[in-house]
Curated annotation (Swiss-Prot):
Its cofactor is Ni cation. The lineage of its organism: Bacteria, Pseudomonadati, Pseudomonadota, Betaproteobacteria, Rhodocyclales. It catalyses: urea + 2 H2O + H(+) = hydrogencarbonate + 2 NH4(+). GO terms for molecular function: nickel cation binding; urease activity. It comes from Dechloromonas aromatica (strain RCB). SUPFAM superfamilies: Composite domain of metallo-dependent hydrolases, Metallo-dependent hydrolases. Residues 132-569 form the Urease domain. Ni(2+) 1 binds at H137, H139, K220, D363. Gene3D superfamilies: Metal-dependent hydrolases, Urease, subunit C, domain 1. GO terms for biological process: urea catabolic process. Its EC number is 3.5.1.5. Heterotrimer of UreA (gamma), UreB (beta) and UreC (alpha) subunits. Three heterotrimers associate to form the active enzyme. This is Urease subunit alpha. The gene is ureC. Keywords: Cytoplasm, Hydrolase, Metal-binding, Nickel. Belongs to the metallo-dependent hydrolases superfamily. Urease alpha subunit family.
Amino acid sequence: MMANKITRQAYAEMFGPTTGDRMRLADTELIIEVEKDYTIYGEEVKFGGGKVIRDGMGQGQRLSAETVDTVITNALIVDAVTGIVKADIGLKEGRIAAIGKAGNPDIQPGVTIVIGPGTEVIAGEGMIVTAGGIDSHIHFICPQQIDEALYSGVTTMIGGGTGPATGTFATTCTPGPWHIHRMLEAADAFPMNLGFLGKGNASLPEALREQVEAGVMGLKLHEDWGTTPAAIDCCLTVADEMDVQVAIHSDTLNESGFVEATLGAFKGRTIHTFHTEGAGGGHAPDIIKAAGLPNVLPSSTNPTMPYTVNTIDEHLDMLMVCHHLDPSIAEDIAFAESRIRRETIAAEDILHDLGAFSMMSSDSQAMGRVGEVIIRTWQAAHKMKLQRGALPEDSARNDNFRVKRYIAKYTINPALTHGIAHTVGSVEVGKLADLVLWKPAFFGVKPSLILKGGMIAAAAMGDPNASIPTPQPVHYRPMFGSFGKALKTSVTFISQAALNNPAIAALGLSKPLVAVSGTRTLTKADMVHNGATPEITVDPETYVVKADGVHLVCEPATELPLAQRYFLF
């Protein structure tokens, strides 16, 4: 049989882009290029009338033991670990079973993903597939946040709280065994991987150990509970003992010491610093110095990202509400103004682009927007490309390295930081099939499908009474993976000590429980594409930020992609 040659455009329209093809991400200035294609030209599989995946053709006769449950065909994977590659993706029992070439091995060569009568198909042609996002800074103020996050492409939420309690409004802590157990029970109701942080502010270890054994996956130090050097040291000691992560919101007012005292209390131990720029809280004006240390894993919260002409004004109002400040009290105004600094906010964008800030998160309803972690990440990447040009690792043809650096900030790096990278955080074989499918024109802003544990949990869906799925109104709706016992496609993360605790088994939880591990030996060098450790200085009077002696300054954006164009309806 003679080969049939078609143009690259025709091929891309039929099977999606292949090696060397380039694609714009939504309306940004970010361009990606396919690095490798695992499918085989002429042997591609595609579902539909007159297409390949039919009995005796692309679909064979093998039983489910030898076939995948679901195949995503001809997908363009964008992942910090796997890269930017074209492949078929096979899902089995809720996990990623294979990334390669799907089909019928009885008649096709090179098949690594077997399609049989028991296989469902999701068309990935022309679609981008990413790992589900991980938001590691959640105030669990209301359960409706979970829907907002899921519909944005987030599939794992880590944080603390008990609902709209005053403590939860300000701090990401689920304190004490009773609250922890109730939140673990509530977690069973949601199509989202959840993990809770206990209150880490204590000068003696017993109450911290009690919380770790009760079911939290980590501990949170917050200045509103008193983040003193003694509390920091105690919390990190318990964390080292029990292999859980510590997150910190340090002392904005410098009451119990300056930034040097806090960094000294770390004693070189691993810690996740929240909103490390400082607008969300932390030693004023120089907590941003922490981002240069090898034991500090720094994250941002999304309101300061990227720096725009509106950032300063909205932050002052947010701060007054979130921390119960009174605009009629001079001391409260001074507190607010000390935290909101143009210079450090501008520097934050650049430190992200350098790979010195490793993670992005939301700070949901507590000076952060839970549905905008992914949007803000890509807006920041776009802004930095416009202002700083191509990264040294990139070529004139594409922004692949920058894209991998930025996607790592809300996928693999928070997974590594919190000890859950063995389960989530990347598109890799063996991990939970928490996958998000995007049309390229809507990348980063409005996903098409959100899979949890291999099952579709949410989708942009049209009128349920229509004759076809697409008529308006099209909006996000929960799918079958969000109901009943199918919620077991999500997991709850707890400590190993809690997993060994009979009191947890006595709760009768229905979701799988997964223990965190490997949190205490991490360093900044483990942060994928985001391991830079420049020496950061802040002038105490002018707030000028320098990294390795270079002044970090950029202009605020007046216009951004992924914004009003996508939210007219």
